[in-house]
């Protein structure tokens, strides 16, 4: 069923890992382990014939690998047309079809996370009569929108934030003025004066900042997660104008937004949204789409907290919630242990509440199940979507268990004032983990369960047992 292929030069890298002495030995080890295809390393083509002659790799092994690859080529139709996927007309008429672009636009909007929204900075209604200053290196950027590892995607075809906004607000009394202010990576502040002057001419300021796409993905580590270059310095100058200040971020991993969280009115995390990025951003900024995405990773208060993840293992000296400053506990002296924005977090242009959590029984045996229900309500004034999340903690196991694990979630659309019931099922399989014997199984014991709107929301809590 398919074939096994390495990562890029994966076989070659075994030499650097000191597993083998040279490329030839690496190829033999890989071939005998069942690796069918050597991705670009050139080791198989250079050494396998010699290895077979020396009896280090069997011909049967080669035949098996070749057959697996040829079978897949046949199934993909490459024997009929080896260039079938390199067709410009196919790309134009299939991949870039209007309905696919619309799907990409909707996906972009649904991927944006609202991190902060003081004073209802967002949305910027099309009914307003205001001037918006668009400041920052990501306002007119197209190149970075596809993100890292975008393959053959045409970066110049991506829609910029500026294009998306000017199309969205065409014919309205919302006017945009623009200044770049700085570039993405350098400390050059020579464009600050123009940006500040532009901001002062506007009613509100929307800064678009982030990272070069090459700063995310493989082999792109950083020691400082603040906005790079002069971007944060520019934000601080924009803040001094006294104008309401919003920020939209284009980046691929968590940033240290501790200053921004304290001083910026509204923050949207847009990520690298792809071809229709600018339209997706404009849909959210205008309020035509109410943001509903949630963080799939925790954002730290500072790099000193890293690694930081919600499902960490327990410590021997946990911090008492009622006394967070207790000495000789596993805590930081200068910041809370908690993230700035936790896993599962995300705001909306409306508000939601989860309550009335119930379990249909407090214990079950293997082969049984428990149903967890809760009520979610849109307590705000506009329609929206939220993600109701269920977390479980195994209180004691033969192998140390995480303090919390996401075990279920449901995205729920609610009109203003509407309520709905959500339900989750807990069974033996949901509680299983790999034990010290490397067998996956659930162990009898006691568990805590929460239903809420992010990984730190513990307002609705209950307990149950597996007997």
Give the predicted meaning of each segment.
Residues 202:
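An anion/phosphate-binding loop that grips the pyrophosphate of nucleotide cofactors and donors
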Residues 143-146, 209-228:
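Glycine/threonine-rich flexible loop motifs
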Residues 430-446:
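Short glycine/proline/serine/threonine-rich loop/turn segments at secondary-structure transition edges
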Residues 19, 50-147, 153-162, 168, ...:
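Secreted, periplasmic, or luminal enzymes acting at the cell surface/secretory milieu
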Residues 381-398, 404-406:
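Short acidic, flexible loop segments centered on an aromatic residue
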Residues 2, 174, 241-245, 264:
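A short helix->loop->beta-strand "cap" motif at the edges of active sites that frequently abuts
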Residues 398-434:
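Intrinsically disordered, low-complexity Pro/Gly/Ser/Thr-rich segments with frequent PxxP/GP/PP motifs
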Residues 1-40, 45-47, 58-61, 68:
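Second-shell residues forming the walls of enzyme active-site clefts
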């Amino acid at each position: 069923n398919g074939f096994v292929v390495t990562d890029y030069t994966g076989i070659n890298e075994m030499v650097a890992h000191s597993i083998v002495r040279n490329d030839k030995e690496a190829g033999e080890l890989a071939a005998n382990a069942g690796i069918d295809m050597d991705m670009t390393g050139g080791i198989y083509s250079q050494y396998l014939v010699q290895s077979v002659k020396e009896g280090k790799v069997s011909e049967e092994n080669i035949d098996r690998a070749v057959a697996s690859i040829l079978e897949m080529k046949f199934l993909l139709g490459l024997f009929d047309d080896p260039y079938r996927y390199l067709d410009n007309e196919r790309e134009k008429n299939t991949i870039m079809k209007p309905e696919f672009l619309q799907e990409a636009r909707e996906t972009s909007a649904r991927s944006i996370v609202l991190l902060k929204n003081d004073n209802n900075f967002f949305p910027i209604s099309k009914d307003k009569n205001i001037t918006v200053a668009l400041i920052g290196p990501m306002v007119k950027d197209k190149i970075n929108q596809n993100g890292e590892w975008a393959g053959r995607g045409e970066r110049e075809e991506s829609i910029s934030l500026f294009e998306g906004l000017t199309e969205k607000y065409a014919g309205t009394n919302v006017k945009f003025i623009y200044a770049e202010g700085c570039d993405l990576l350098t400390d050059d502040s020579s464009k600050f004066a123009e940006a500040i002057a532009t901001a002062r001419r506007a009613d509100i300021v929307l800064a678009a900042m982030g990272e070069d796409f090459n700063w995310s993905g493989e082999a792109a580590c950083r020691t400082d997660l603040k906005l790079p270059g002069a971007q944060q310095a520019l934000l601080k100058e924009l803040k001094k104008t006294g104008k309401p200040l919003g920020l939209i971020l284009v980046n691929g991993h968590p940033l240290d937004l501790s200053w921004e969280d304290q001083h910026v009115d509204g923050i949207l995390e847009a990520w690298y949204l792809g071809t229709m990025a600018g339209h997706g951003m404009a849909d959210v900024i205008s309020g035509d789409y109410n943001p509903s995405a949630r963080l799939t990773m925790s954002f730290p208060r500072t790099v000193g907290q890293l690694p930081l993840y919600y499902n960490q293992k327990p410590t021997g000296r946990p911090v008492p919630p009622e006394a967070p400053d207790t000495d000789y506990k596993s805590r930081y002296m200068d910041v809370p242990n908690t993230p700035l924005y936790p896993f599962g977090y995300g705001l909306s242009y409306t508000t939601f509440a989860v309550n009335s959590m119930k379990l249909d029984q407090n214990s079950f045996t293997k082969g049984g199940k428990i149903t967890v229900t809760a009520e979610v309500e849109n307590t705000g004034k506009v329609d929206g979507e939220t993600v109701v999340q269920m977390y479980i903690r195994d209180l004691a196991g033969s192998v140390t268990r995480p303090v919390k694990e996401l075990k279920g979630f449901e995205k729920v659309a609610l009109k203003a004032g509407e309520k709905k019931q959500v339900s989750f099922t807990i069974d033996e399989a949901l509680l299983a983990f790999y034990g010290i014997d490397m067998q996956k199984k659930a162990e009898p014991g006691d568990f805590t369960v929460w239903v809420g709107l992010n990984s730190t929301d513990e307002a609705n809590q209950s307990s149950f047992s597996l007997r």
